[in-house]
Each structure stands twice: as structure tokens, then as C-alpha cells.
């Protein structure tokens, strides 16, 4: 009740001020249009004397503007205390329009009194313009009281609530990767840093094609880690994009290494620009389980659907058979023929020759007992099916160029050997992905085993477009390599792609064990998963209720997604969200980021123009200078086949000469 009385009293005061304002405006008209007033007969003697006294003592009418200014002041005060009904469509444009028009009519009409017309004409025009101006000013003032002070629709995408302070301090250590950023906070763009102070906790870079993964992040990983003396293994899906960056950056930063590193390339497309390396080098295989790992990697890369069927009979059988062949080649004459091409050629011999040879060795007899039972039991169809499961996919890999690269021994795969550090790039080709990925997967699996050891040089494994290759043991590498100073950086498009090619279980392990996450634009379940990973933050909510007589505003807070899935689904190229991990002695308070990664495009373009192509490694020339590439690799191809034929013939002959096993050789 008291509040209503107060409002009623306030209303009376405002009405009084408005009335005084109107009286002052009338006094202005009465004084400056006095002759017309006299003609109209509205002059009053008492009023005349009062106005003359006001003018004599206060100079009220010394200027035509004085009374107008006082009138406007009182009008403004009356409007200020008026509580109007809020209107959502009321805008400042409308208000400013009527205020400007009203001010012009109210203040700038003095010249009308000087027009060379009758006094009545002057007075009529003056009164009309002043009245119209006053009404416009009154409307503008009242509309201001009806204007909504807070437009809830100014931030329709909730950018202000979802922007947050990010890391602005540069944190550098001997392993860190540091990316400059620009982020939006409190209605302005700020400079910041993404500090990956512990790359050994693994990093993954997600984003749809064209989101800027390689340009903004992967390229920077390669450059900065070379600058800090990392040994590197780079899987270059679109060879030579990453390879040229690594090669040229290494040329300019050899001084970052205590021992000068060597640059090696595996490239099946062009043997001239490829080193040769045997991924199943017998020197690095100590147990038959190593042979099994190699066979497992090859077969699952050739048959991606088998990843979901691990443990099935027709999946394990060809893997075990290939593993036995690899181990046989390892123990035969101290690994003289222990290469993958030799294993393929051996597998393609008739099974009547394969099994007697393999079972001649005690350490393989038990390993192959299921095959021997099927053979001796007359289950020829089953046996042929098992062998065909291995032969058919491996036959796709029979290629002179591939045989050439995989039978040489230019270098070993222990890339982080402190005495012989290496930067190794392996190139794939999207057009031959299914064939090359299997061979390159073999290099991957061997490297994982060799680099994940104590007392080695700090190293980095960078895999671009991870789902295009099956990386056996990747989940274990991420989980255990931190203490061995192995940094892993994985690039792929989204989690569904990873799940499709690696299976649900392995995909989940990779997702949940990676410590540093970068994501460009991704959609669907991937965006939702990332949004949940980034967590929630306390956000302010404001609601407004407008009725005929009043407006009420309520402000509340609630926990909501810091970076919602909808934002992640619509990120601009070059803008990334993510989170980084820190160290005990290098705490990062704000690990989450949502920022544009700043890349000096002019500098990068200049660097790329100055890049040298990867040089020719092997010159395939005859004495007369003519090219003999085809002849050389074909000769190597025939040599591999002939070596296996010779091996098989000698072993069969030896078995025939062994009475205990001669029964395994069927009589012709």
C-alpha cells in the first residue's frame, strides 16, 4: 500500500514539473508575441507586471532561449520520473528522430518572428512550430521511459556467456610446442598461447577436411620438434606434403642435435626417392611373438574388417601361418632371406611344400599343429581355405617396386638411437592406399617396439590421417611411452572414422588416453563427446516479463556447456577448440581453449617457395647414362622369387633325406 502511495506522489510531482514546463513555454510565447496577444485581447496587466519584474531581476527574457531551456529541463525531469509501459519494438532510432525534429522546431524557430509579414502571421507560425516541437520532445522523453534497457536478443548465439579467459602467458620448455592464438573475450579479441608443455601425453588433432589441421597444427608440431632436436617418424598420407616440410626444416636446424641426424624416406611410388629398409630385420626379432605382431599388422591392414573379428578362427589362422613363415625365414641361415617379399613368395608355394618345411623345425611344429592335423586328417578343403585367406590379400602386395624397397637395408628403424638419430618419413598414396598401408603398417609396428625403450633420444611419432593405416600397438604406445620421451601426434577427421577402422574398443582407448586435444569443425557424436570433455561452466541467465503496467527482470545462474556441440559443429577454418595437459612444475590454470591459431601466412608462403624438393637418393643409370630403373627393380623381383625357389628345393631335398619326416612328402 505504501509503495502505491509513493508512486502516486511521484506521479503528482512529475505532473507538476510538466505543468511548470508548459507555463514557461507559454510565457515565452506571451513575451515575444505580445503585439499579437494584444490584438487577440489576451493580455493581462498583472501578468505583464510579473513578467517585467522577472526580466528585470533575473534577465529571464534577455534571450529567447532562456525560457525554452528551462522549459526543456523541467520537461526532461518530468519524463525521467515517468514509468512508461515497456515496448519491445521501441528503438533508439525512433527516439532520436523525434528528439531531433522537436529540438529544431522548438529552438530554431526564432527567425519566424523576423519574417516581413504581419504580427498575427508571425505569431501564428511561431506558436505552431513551438507547440509541435514541444510535443515531439515530450514524445521522445516518454518513449525513452518505454525503452527496454537490456535487449536480450543482442547476443542470440550466447557468445558472451560462452567466451572465457584463456592462457595468455607463453610457457616454453625443452619439449613444448607453443601455438600463438587470438581469442574472443569480453567483446574484444585478445592474444594468447596454446602451450603443449607435455607432448609425451599424446596429442590428437581432429577436424573435417579443410578445417586447417595440418596447416595450423601438424606442420607446427613438425617444425618445433625438429627445432628442439627430436628424432621423428612421420606418416605422410599425401606424400610429399609433410615430408618436404620436415626435410627443409631439418636442413636449417641440424644444430639442434648433438649428433647429426639422418633423413630417410620410404616411398613405394618412386624408388629413386626412396631408401630401402627391411621392416622384419632379423636382428630386431628376438621371439616368435615379434613375427606374430608383424603378421598381425599386415593381415589386419589388408583386411580392415578383420579388426572387428579378432580371435575368430578364419582370422587367426592366416595370421599364424604368416607368422610361422616369417619366423622360419628368421631362423633359416641366420635370417639370410628374412624379408617381407620373401615371406610372400614362400607363402605362394604349394602347401605340400610349405608345411613339411615349416614342421621340420621343432619351434614351429607346435605352432602349426592345427594345420598339420587338418592336412594329415584329410581336411584339404579347410586347409585350402585357411591358406587362401592369407594368400589372396597378400597377392595384392606383389609389386617389383615394393619388393625393391622392402628387401634393402639402408638403415634400421631404431630412429631414437642416441648414436644414430633419424628423421624418417613414410609416404602413402591415396590412390594405392589399400596396398601401401599394409606395408607401411609393418614399419609402424616395428618402430613402436623399437622406440619405446629407456635411455633413448626424445622422439616424436606423427601420424596424419590415422584411419588410413592400421597402427598395431598404438593404444599401448600412448599409454606407456610418456616415460620414454615418445611424443605421439595423431591426425584424423572424427571419432566415428576412427571407430570404423580401429573398432570400438581400441578407438575408445585412444580417445580416452590422449592428453592434448585439438579440434576444428566436427559434427554429430564427436562434437557432443568433445563438448562433454570440456565440461560445464556457471553461466548467467536473464529473463524479462512485460505486462500492461509493469516489467520484471530476473537473473539466475546455471551450469551449462563451456563449448556446446553446436559451436564445435560450426567452427571457422583455422579456429580450434581443445584442451592441453600440464606438468607438476608447470601448472596451466586454464587448459581449455577456443581460439584462432595464428599462422603467419606470408612467412609460410615465403618458406614454401624456398623449399628444396627431396633429392634423388638412388640413381638408376647404366654406364652410358640411360635409365635402368625398371630393369633393376625387375631383376630384384626375379631374384627374390628365385631365392625362394632355391630355398624350397633345398629344404624339400633335405626332408626327403630325413627318414623320420620323409613321409610328409607325398609320392608323385
Go through each PLM region and give its residues:
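P-loop NTPase motor domains
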Residues: 25, 42, 149-153, 194-486, ...
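Basic- and hydrophobic-enriched, low-structure N-terminal and domain-boundary segments
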Residues: 1-211, 215, 220, 547-548, ...
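Hydrophobic alpha-helical segments involved in membrane association or supramolecular assembly
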Residues: 75-83, 441, 445, 516, ...
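Glycine-centered small-residue hotspots that permit tight backbone geometry or close packing
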Residues: 132-134, 467, 574
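Ordered hydrophobic segments in well-structured contexts
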Residues: 176-178, 425, 575-579, 592-594
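Intrinsic-disorder/low-complexity loop/linker signature
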Residues: 187, 191, 550-551, 601, ...
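Conserved ATP-driven motor cores of ASCE-family P-loop NTPases powering translocation/secretion/packaging/pilus
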Residues: 478-480, 484-581
Amino acid at each position: 500500500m505504501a509503495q502505491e502511495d509513493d508512486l502516486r506522489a511521484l506521479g503528482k510531482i512529475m505532473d507538476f514539473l510538466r505543468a511548470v514546463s508548459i507555463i514557461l513555454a507559454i510565457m515565452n510565447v506571451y513575451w515575444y508575441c505580445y503585439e499579437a496577444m494584444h490584438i487577440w485581447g489576451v493580455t493581462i496587466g498583472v501578468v505583464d507586471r510579473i513578467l517585467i519584474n522577472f526580466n528585470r531581476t533575473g534577465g529571464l527574457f534577455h534571450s529567447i532561449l532562456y525560457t525554452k531551456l528551462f522549459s526543456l529541463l523541467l520537461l526532461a525531469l518530468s519524463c525521467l520520473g515517468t514509468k512508461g509501459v515497456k515496448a519491445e519494438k521501441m528503438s533508439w532510432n525512433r527516439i532520436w528522430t523525434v528528439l531531433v525534429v522537436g529540438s529544431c522546431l522548438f529552438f530554431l524557430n526564432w527567425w519566424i518572428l523576423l519574417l516581413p509579414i504581419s504580427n498575427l502571421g508571425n505569431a501564428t507560425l511561431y506558436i505552431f512550430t513551438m507547440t509541435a516541437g514541444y510535443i515531439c520532445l515530450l514524445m521522445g522523453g516518454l518513449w525513452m521511459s518505454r525503452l527496454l534497457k537490456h535487449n536480450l536478443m543482442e547476443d542470440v548465439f550466447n557468445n558472451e556467456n560462452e567466451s572465457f579467459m584463456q592462457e595468455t602467458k607463453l610457457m616454453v620448455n625443452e619439449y613444448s610446442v607453443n601455438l600463438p592464438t587470438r581469442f574472443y573475450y569480453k567483446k574484444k579479441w585478445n592474444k594468447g598461447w596454446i602451450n603443449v608443455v607435455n607432448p609425451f601425453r599424446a596429442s590428437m588433432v581432429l577436424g573435417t577436411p579443410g578445417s586447417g589441421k595440418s596447416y595450423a597444427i601438424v606442420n607446427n608440431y613438425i617444425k618445433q620438434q625438429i627445432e628442439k632436436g627430436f628424432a621423428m617418424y612421420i606418416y605422410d598420407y599425401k606424400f610429399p606434403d609433410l615430408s618436404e616440410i620436415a626435410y627443409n626444416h631439418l636442413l636449417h636446424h641440424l644444430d639442434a642435435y648433438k649428433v647429426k641426424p639422418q633423413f630417410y624416406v620410404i616411398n613405394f611410388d618412386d624408388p629413386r626417392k626412396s631408401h630401402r629398409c627391411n621392416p622384419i630385420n632379423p636382428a630386431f626379432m628376438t621371439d616368435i611373438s615379434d613375427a606374430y605382431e608383424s603378421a598381425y599388422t599386415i593381415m589386419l591392414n589388408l583386411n580392415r574388417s578383420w579388426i572387428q573379428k579378432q580371435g575368430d578362427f578364419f582370422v587367426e589362422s592366416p595370421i599364424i601361418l604368416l607368422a610361422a613363415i616369417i619366423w622360419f625365414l628368421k631362423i633359416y641361415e641366420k635370417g639370410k632371406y628374412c624379408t617381407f617379399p620373401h615371406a610372400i613368395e614362400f607363402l605362394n608355394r604349394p602347401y605340400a611344400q610349405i608345411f613339411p618345411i615349416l614342421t621340420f623345425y621343432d619351434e614351429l611344429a607346435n605352432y602349426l599343429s592345427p594345420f598339420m592335423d587338418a592336412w594329415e586328417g584329410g581336411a584339404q578343403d579347410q586347409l585350402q581355405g585357411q591358406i587362401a585367406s592369407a594368400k589372396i590379400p597378400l597377392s595384392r602386395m606383389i609389386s617389383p617396386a615394393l619388393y625393391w624397397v622392402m628387401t634393402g637395408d639402408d638403415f634400421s628403424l631404431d630412429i631414437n638411437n642416441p648414436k644414430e638419430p633419424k628423421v624418417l618419413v613414410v609416404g602413402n598414396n591415396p590412390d594405392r592406399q589399400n596396398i601401401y598401408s599394409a606395408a607401411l603398417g609393418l614399419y609402424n609396428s616395428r618402430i613402436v617396439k623399437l622406440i619405446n625403450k629407456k635411455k633413448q633420444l626424445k622422439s616424436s611419432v606423427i601420424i596424419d590421417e590415422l584411419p588410413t593405416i592400421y597402427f598395431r600397438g598404438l593404444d599401448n604406445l600412448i599409454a606407456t611411452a610418456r616415460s620414454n620421451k615418445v611424443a605421439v601426434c595423431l591426425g584424423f577427421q572424427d571419432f566415428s572414422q576412427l571407430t570404423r577402422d580401429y573398432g570400438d574398443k581400441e578407438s575408445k582407448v585412444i580417445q580416452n588416453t590422449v592428453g592434448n586435444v585439438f579440434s576444428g569443425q566436427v559434427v554429430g557424436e564427436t562434437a557432443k563427446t568433445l563438448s562433454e570433455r570440456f565440461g560445464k561452466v556457471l553461466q548467467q541467465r536473464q529473463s524479462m516479463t512485460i505486462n500492461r503496467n509493469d516489467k520484471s527482470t530476473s537473473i539466475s545462474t546455471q551450469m551449462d556447456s563451456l563449448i556446446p556441440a553446436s559451436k564445435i559443429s560450426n567452427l571457422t577454418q583455422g579456429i580450434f577448440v581443445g584442451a592441453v595437459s600440464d606438468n607438476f612444475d608447470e601448472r596451466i590454470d586454464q587448459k581449455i581453449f577456443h581460439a584462432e591459431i595464428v599462422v603467419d601466412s606470408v612467412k609460410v608462403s615465403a618458406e614454401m617457395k624456398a623449399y628444396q624438393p627431396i633429392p634423388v637418393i638412388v640413381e638408376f643409370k647404366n654406364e652410358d647414362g640411360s635409365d635402368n630403373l625398371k630393369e633393376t627393380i625387375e631383376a630384384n623381383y626375379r631374384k627374390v622369387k628365385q631365392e625362394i625357389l632355391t630355398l624350397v628345393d633345398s629344404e624339400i631335398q633335405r626332408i626327403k633325406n630325413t627318414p623320420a619326416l620323409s613321409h610328409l612328402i607325398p609320392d608323385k
